C-alpha cells in the first residue's frame, strides 16, 4: 500500500506533466508552510502565501483550494537534505507529510533539494532592499518560490 504514495523523481515528474502546467511549490517548515505558484509556461515562480502547519486537515483543505482555484497540475516540495547530502529527521518529517498529501490529492508530487533555499530567499530580498520585518514575515513563501524556481529551471532542460 505504501508504494502507491511514494514520491517520484523530478524526471518522472517531468514525464507526468505537460509543458503548459501550473505547479505549486511548498516549503514545509516546523510551524509554517510556504507556498509559491508558477505560471502555466513554468517560467517564473511567485511567492503566494504562508499557511500554518498546526492543523493538518485545515492545511490540506487550504492546499486543495489553492490547487483547484489555480489549476495546479503538480507539486514540488522542498527536501531538507543536510549539507553533507545525508537525510536527517526533517527529511523524514517532510516525506511523512508528502505521503499524507498524496493520500488526499491526486496530482504528481516530487521532492526537490532545498539546501540553502531560506538563505537564498533572505539574500534575494536583501538585494531587493526589502525591510527585515517583511523579509522574515514572507520568508516561508519566498523560500517556496526559490525551491519551485530551481525545479522549473531544471524541468526546462
Predicted regions span which residues?
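Phosphate- and other anionic-substrate recognition elements at nucleic-acid/protein interfaces
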Residues: 6-24, 31-157
Amino acid at each position: 500500500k505504501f508504494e502507491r504514495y511514494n514520491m517520484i523523481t523530478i524526471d518522472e515528474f517531468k514525464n507526468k506533466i505537460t509543458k503548459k502546467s501550473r505547479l505549486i511549490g511548498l516549503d514545509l517548515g516546523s510551524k509554517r508552510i510556504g507556498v509559491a505558484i508558477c505560471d502555466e509556461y513554468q517560467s517564473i515562480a511567485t511567492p503566494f502565501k504562508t499557511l500554518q502547519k498546526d492543523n493538518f486537515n485545515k492545511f490540506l483543505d487550504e492546499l486543495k483550494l489553492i490547487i483547484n482555484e489555480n489549476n495546479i497540475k503538480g507539486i514540488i516540495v522542498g527536501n531538507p537534505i543536510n549539507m553533507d547530502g545525508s537525510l536527517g529527521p526533517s527529511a523524514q518529517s517532510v516525506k511523512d507529510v508528502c505521503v499524507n498529501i498524496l493520500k488526499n490529492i491526486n496530482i504528481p508530487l516530487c521532492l526537490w533539494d532545498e539546501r540553502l533555499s531560506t538563505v537564498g530567499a533572505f539574500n534575494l530580498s536583501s538585494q531587493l532592499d526589502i525591510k527585515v520585518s517583511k523579509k522574515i514575515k514572507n520568508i516561508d513563501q519566498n523560500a517556496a518560490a526559490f525551491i519551485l524556481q530551481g525545479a522549473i529551471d531544471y524541468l526546462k532542460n
